[in-house]
Regions:
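Membrane-inserting effector segments that mediate pore formation, membrane fusion
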Residues: 231-271
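Residue-level signature of catalytic and energy-coupling elements of molecular machines
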Residues: 20, 99, 200
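C-terminal accessory extensions appended to soluble enzyme cores
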Residues: 196, 201-239, 260
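Conserved G1/Walker A P-loop phosphate-binding module
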Residues: 1-72
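Canonical P-loop GTPase G-domain recognition
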Residues: 135-212
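Flexible beta-alpha connector loops of hexameric P-loop NTPases
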Residues: 72-80
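Conserved C-terminal guanine-recognition region of P-loop GTPase G domains, centered on the G4
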Residues: 59-63, 84-170
Length: 271
């Protein structure tokens, strides 16, 4: 049995969409480019196929197929473009979430983003609005991007909490800022490491339910840094027995995700 899901990555060209996809997945899934001609009019897709490791030996095998869609630069979109692209995505398989990227100082039209967010929320698609390349502009530009995100999302849901540099709007949306790869400016002697990726992944985990939650976990299954760094938070969130997990890891190796995701499934479908 194959369960199919889609993730849409949206935003203007050259804001770090592909870099973010690779950082989330923990490996190179999407091709990156520094070219000024990196915009494209066609959607690209990257398919991740995962086999479900059931905690119940007798259970039938389940495959999860997750397609990550890298959409064309949104700056040229009209409302018809939004509807066309998302109709295509929704007809392909179950939409999991939409991740919108904007970097400090990048071109953004809030009316287009509003169409996008409204389309997703009406279709029960979780929205993550992300300020990418957070150090590529000044603090003022970064703050402006995040303020625009917050202002837009409060039209659809009040902010329910603010944790680990992430603002949550119920189980409808979140917004945050990240640095997907090391940022370095030799001229002024600034070097910033990767920031916010683990927190973003965990934030989406806390916001999704049932099969969408499981599909997201399989999307980031190979991100070993996330699973090793955030294991305790995941175990606490789903009230997973630590002794059981430790026993599995000692017996079968240190691939945390392989044994933790089935335990997450068991806890998620029990709720």
């Amino acid at each position: 049995m194959v369960k199919q899901f889609n993730i849409a990555i949206c935003g203007s060209a050259r804001v770090g969409k592909s870099t973010l996809v690779n950082a989330l997945c923990g490996k190179e899934v999407a091709k990156t480019s520094s070219s000024l001609c990196s915009a494209t009019d066609e959607m690209k897709k990257y398919v991740l196929n995962r086999s479900c490791q059931s905690v119940n030996e007798a259970a039938s095998s389940i495959e999860y197929s997750i397609t990550v869609w890298d959409t064309p630069g949104i700056e040229s979109w009209t409302i018809d473009n939004v509807q066309k692209h998302f109709t295509k995505i929704m007809l392909e398989s179950t939409p999991l979430c939409m991740i919108y990227c904007a970097s400090p100082g990048s071109f953004a039209r809030l009316d287009q983003l509003q169409w996008l967010v409204e389309t997703c929320i009406k279709s029960n698609i979780f929205c993550a609005l992300v300020c990418t390349n957070k150090y590529s502009g000044g603090n003022q530009q970064r703050t402006q991007v995040l303020n625009d995100f917050h202002s837009l999302l409060t039209h659809y849901h009040t902010m329910t909490r603010d944790e680990a540099n992430i603002k949550y709007y119920g189980n409808v949306a979140l917004c945050t800022s990240v640095n997907s790869i090391i940022y370095e400016d030799i001229d002024i002697g600034v070097r910033k490491g990767v920031e916010g990726i683990n927190e973003l992944i965990f934030g989406i985990i806390t916001s999704l339910k049932d099969d969408k939650l499981v599909a997201w976990c399989y999307t980031i299954a190979e991100n070993q840094l996330f699973w090793s760094t955030m294991r305790d938070k995941v175990v606490e969130l789903f009230n997973i027995s630590r002794p059981i997990l430790e026993e599995l890891l000692q017996k079968h190796g240190k691939d945390i995700a392989r044994y933790l995701i089935p335990l997450i499934m068991k806890a998620a479908f029990k709720k």
